[in-house]
C-alpha cells in the first residue's frame, strides 16, 4: 500500500453504483474505503473500483457514524506495534452512539483483494455523542463530543482499553464541529454556540460578550496535555468550517467568507466574501487572486 493514502473524490454521474458515496480514501489501485449515506444511515464501506461492487459494509455504530480517520502513525496493542502495511490498514470511527472504535482491514496485496475485517477495540468515554476522532502526528488520538469535551488518548491500547491522558471542557452550551491537526501536534477545533441548547438569559449574556467562546480554538499537544494557544473569534453565524493549511498559513472558509491567518502569530492577514469574488469581472478576479497570492507569500 502506498504510504501516502490518497483522498479520493468520486463523481456520482460517472459511476451509478457510487451514487450515494460522498468520498473516501483510495487504499490501492482497486480498493476504496468511503462513507456512504443511504436510507438515513451513515456507514463506512469498502468498495472494489475494478468490479464497481461494495464488498464490505461496516455498520458497527448502528448506522450513525460521525467521522472516520485512517491511522497513518503507529499504535500499540498490549505493547505490540501495529501500523498500516502491505497487507492491512487501520482506521478510527466515531458515532452518535457515544463510542469511538479502532478497526483493521486486511487484504492480499498481490491481488488487491479484501480478506478480513476486525473490530479491534471500542471506547465509550463520554455520556454524549462523539463528533470527531483523529490520530495526530505523535500517534495519539483526539476526540470531541457534544458534552463540550476535547479528550486526548494515548496510542497505547491495553486489555482492549484506550488510555485517557487529558480532557478539557468548554462552557455550556458550546458544541464542537471541526477537529483537525494544523501541523505537528498543533490542533484546531471549532466551538459553535448551540442556540438549541441555550436558554434566553444565556443567549443575552453571550451577545453582550460578543460570543467570546465561539470560533476556532488553537491548541498544542505537549507532554500528554492539551494547552490552549489562541482563539480566533467572531465567526458564529452558523454553517460549517472548512480549512486548508499552506505552509505557515491557515485558510478558513465558513459560509461565503474566507479568512487567511498567519500561523506564526495567528494574525488575520486577509479576508473576503466568496460571493463578491464570483460577481467580479475577469480582470478584477485576476487582480484579487494576485493580491491573495502576494499575501500568502508574506
Role assignments for model-derived ranges:
Residues 1-45, 191-197, 202-217:
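Intrinsically disordered, low-complexity acidic/Ser/Thr/Pro-rich linker and tail segments
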Residues 18-25, 63-83, 127-135, 172-180, ...:
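Canonical WD40 repeat/beta-propeller blade segments in eukaryotic WD-repeat proteins
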Residues 35-40, 94-97, 144-147, 190-193, ...:
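Conserved strand-to-loop turn within each blade of WD40 beta-propeller repeats
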Residues 44-47, 100-105, 151-155, 219, ...:
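WD40-repeat beta-propellers
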Residues 104-113, 154-160, 221-223:
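Short loop/turn segments immediately following beta-strands, especially the blade-tip
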Residues 29-30, 87-89, 138-140, 183-185, ...:
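Short coil/turn segments that connect the beta-strands within blades of beta-propeller domains
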Residues 6-17, 53-58, 118-123, 161-169, ...:
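A short beta-strand motif characteristic of beta-propeller blades
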Residues 283-298:
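Blade-level signature of beta-propeller repeat domains, shared across WD40, Kelch, NHL, RCC1
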Amino acid at each position: 500500500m502506498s504510504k501516502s493514502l490518497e483522498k479520493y473524490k468520486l463523481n456520482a454521474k460517472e459511476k451509478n453504483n457510487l451514487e450515494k458515496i460522498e468520498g473516501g480514501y483510495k487504499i490501492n489501485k482497486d480498493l476504496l474505503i468511503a462513507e456512504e449515506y443511504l436510507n438515513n444511515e451513515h456507514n463506512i464501506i469498502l468498495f472494489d473500483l475494478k468490479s464497481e461492487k461494495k464488498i464490505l459494509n461496516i455498520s458497527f455504530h448502528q448506522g450513525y457514524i460521525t467521522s472516520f480517520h485512517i491511522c497513518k502513525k503507529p499504535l500499540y496493542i498490549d505493547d505490540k506495534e501495529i501500523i498500516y502495511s502491505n497487507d492491512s490498514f487501520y482506521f478510527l470511527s466515531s458515532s452518535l452512539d457515544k463510542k469511538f472504535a479502532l478497526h483493521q482491514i486486511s487484504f492480499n496485496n498481490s491481488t488487491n483483494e479484501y480478506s478480513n475485517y476486525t473490530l479491534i477495540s471500542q471506547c465509550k468515554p463520554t455520556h454524549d455523542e462523539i463528533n470527531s476522532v483523529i490520530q495526530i502526528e505523535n500517534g495519539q488520538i483526539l476526540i470531541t463530543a457534544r458534552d463540550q469535551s476535547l479528550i486526548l488518548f494515548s496510542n497505547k491500547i491495553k486489555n482492549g482499553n484506550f488510555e485517557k491522558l487529558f480532557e478539557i471542557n468548554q462552557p455550556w452550551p458550546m458544541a464542537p464541529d471541526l477537529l483537525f491537526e494544523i501541523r505537528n501536534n498543533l490542533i484546531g477545533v471549532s466551538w459553535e454556540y448551540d442556540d438549541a441548547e441555550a436558554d434566553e438569559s444565556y443567549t443575552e449574556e453571550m451577545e453582550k460578550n460578543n460570543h467570546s467562546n465561539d470560533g476556532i480554538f488553537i491548541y498544542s499537544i505537549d507532554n500528554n496535555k492539551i494547552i490552549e494557544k489562541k482563539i480566533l473569534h467572531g465567526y458564529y453565524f452558523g454553517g460549517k468550517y472548512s480549512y486548508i493549511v499552506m505552509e505557515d498559513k491557515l485558510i478558513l472558509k465558513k459560509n461565503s467568507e474566507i479568512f487567511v491567518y498567519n500561523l506564526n502569530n495567528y494574525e488575520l492577514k486577509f479576508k473576503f466574501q466568496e460571493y463578491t469574488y464570483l460577481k467580479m469581472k475577469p480582470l478584477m478576479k485576476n487582480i484579487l487572486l494576485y493580491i491573495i497570492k502576494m499575501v500568502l507569500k508574506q
